[in-house]
Amino acid sequence: MKFGLTAVLLVTSAGAFAQFGPPPGGPPRPAKATAPEDLTGYWVALVTEDWRWRMVTPAKGDYDGVPLNPAGRKLADTWDPAKDEAAGNQCKAYGAAAITRVPGRFHITWQDDNTLKLETDAGTQTRLFHFGGKFPESGDAGWQGYSVASWDHQAGGGFGPPGPGGSLKVVTTHIKPGYLRKNGVPYSANAVVTEYFDAIKEPDGEQYLVVKTLVDDPQYLAGQFITSTHFKKEPDGAKWRPTPCAAR
């Protein structure tokens, strides 16, 4: 019996070694090589919800659907686009907490093996997603903040390896204060933005990108602000039209 148990353990160990490979010791594989899905290319926003807040500038005081606390509502009620324009703050609604809701296009490429770059034609913004990056200790990193990325792989069954597919998870901090909506609905420098990017390929070959965004801001929000935004992949950049930020 002892011999039989030993043999079973040896076979099991050998199988596990073959399945998972040798113990880790070398450098980690770059993020580009371990990507569970291809997010690169041109993507156009599909405005299928929240039309009145995304396609036109809402009226002052229209912050339905955003869990503002009293401080957030008070600040939103003071919105003055002319003051933003005079101060050079036309990009307040194009920051990391809101840019996915701005109608337009994304262009996603790899800047290097561990940095994914997302550009927008609306507002001409650039975001960098750093795999294995560390958040700075202080200071703001501009409208797009500092983003740390990771692959959120699907779990495998039992003791198996991760299953196929997965999401890109991005956590952004150190953001310059801005607007969740163009009519002055605020978020502060303390906001934390967590995003999940998922690519979907339909049987007919059409490809879509779904971005789930969660904004936490203890200064102006009484709860988490959650949105889900959809994009469709385009064959090339023929319709790419960079435009400047607009305050209204």
Q: What does each model-found stretch correspond to?
A:
Residues L5-T6, A16:
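Cleavable N-terminal signal peptides
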Residues F17-R248:
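PEST-like low-complexity, intrinsically disordered acidic/proline/serine-rich tracts
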